[in-house]
């Protein structure tokens, strides 16, 4: 049987570059075991932090070591940009020849330029199937403002929020105090200030005072031109995984327990800082409500293949509030998404196989 050549695309121009490598290593391992090994051939492609694509030995080395390439290694890697300085000024990257050999793409790129619709647009232009959401679903799942507006239209309950632009924060020192007044009046304290288009809690701050609010807005504006401020809520953080295309399934519900003030980047990716409770110790009726809302959110943003949907469970009032949808969640062996499916009866290798089959199904014109 002819093997399907899977283009495993990882790294990227993002603050989540290292997380992408971890996810890609886990997926490569899953593609190399048992039945998957007889069906799939892995063609790894590594996108450097400057945006250049590498194929051949370089990405294989990154997968083996789990570490980004050093600058000295990048300059001599196979598939790198031509050494002609005039060409370098014209194009930031050139496509390695191995791109033409790919039967299906498996992008494992987290954050901007990876799960925001940009790479999905490129893969769509290639007219080759790829795992995950398309341009629309990816873009909607990345931009927190567009996402929240969509959830609102879908009738999904969520925390109060206010959308802000960088111009409002930086343009006029006379306008900024009024903006802070409006935020305080609408949301109160504590509140969370977030860049609209970054993942893994990068640039997010919890604020409890005017001074902290001003500093957090200034910091978030350095990451993104679109910002969102959310009202704080005393709640448990629970998550549900979704798998499928037009008839998706929801996993069991899991809960995140952590020892920090909120689930920030350090807590997410530092060992033993957070515990995953699967299934979450919540009432069955609440779990079913979360699963239903996860499927509604998946459909609302036009997601495909996979997504992890995050919620707040306000135990005191029995309310469930949707927080966000992540259309390309972390995919290490210990990440919440594969763990939720493992507890739902789908092993990691089987999950990877099903995602590839879902991508082929979605691409098929029938």
From Swiss-Prot:
Needed cofactors: Mg(2+); Mn(2+)
Q: Which reaction does it catalyse?
A: 2 D-alanine + ATP = D-alanyl-D-alanine + ADP + phosphate + H(+)
Q: Does the keyword Magnesium belong to this entry? A: yes
Please name the Gene3D superfamilies in this protein's record. 3.40.50.20, ATP-grasp fold, A domain (3.30.1490.20), ATP-grasp fold, B domain (3.30.470.20)
What the entry lists under HAMAP family is as follows: Dala_Dala_lig (MF_00047)
In the UniProt record, does the keyword Ligase occur? yes
Co-factor binding comment? Binds 2 magnesium or manganese ions per subunit.
What family name appears in the similarity comment?
A: Belongs to the D-alanine--D-alanine ligase family.
UniProt: Mg(2+) 2 binding residues: 324, 326
**Annotated InterPro entries:** ATP-grasp (IPR011761), ATP_grasp_subdomain_1 (IPR013815), D-Ala_lig_Van_CS (IPR000291), D_ala_D_ala (IPR005905), Dala_Dala_lig_C (IPR011095), Dala_Dala_lig_N (IPR011127), PreATP-grasp_dom_sf (IPR016185)
This protein's species is Nostoc punctiforme (strain ATCC 29133 / PCC 73102)
Name recorded for this polypeptide: D-alanine--D-alanine ligase
Q: In which pathway does it act?
A: Cell wall biogenesis; peptidoglycan biosynthesis
Q: What is the lineage of its organism?
A: Bacteria, Bacillati, Cyanobacteriota, Cyanophyceae, Nostocales
Instruction: Please state what class of enzyme this protein is.
Output: ligase
Keyword set for this entry? Answer: ATP-binding, Cell shape, Cell wall biogenesis/degradation, Cytoplasm, Ligase, Magnesium, Manganese, Metal-binding, Nucleotide-binding, Peptidoglycan synthesis
Q: Which residues bind Mg(2+) 1?
A: 310, 324
**GO CC entries:** cytosol
Which residues make up the binding site for ATP?
184-239
EC number(s) reported in the record: 6.3.2.4
Annotated ATP-grasp domain residues: 148-357
Q: What is its main location?
A: cytoplasm
Q: Where in the cell is it found?
A: Cytoplasm
For molecular function, the Gene Ontology terms on record are: ATP binding; D-alanine-D-alanine ligase activity; metal ion binding
Q: Which domain of life is it from?
A: Bacteria
Kindly list the biological process annotations in GO that this record carries.
Answer: cell wall organization; peptidoglycan biosynthetic process; regulation of cell shape
Entry function: Cell wall formation.
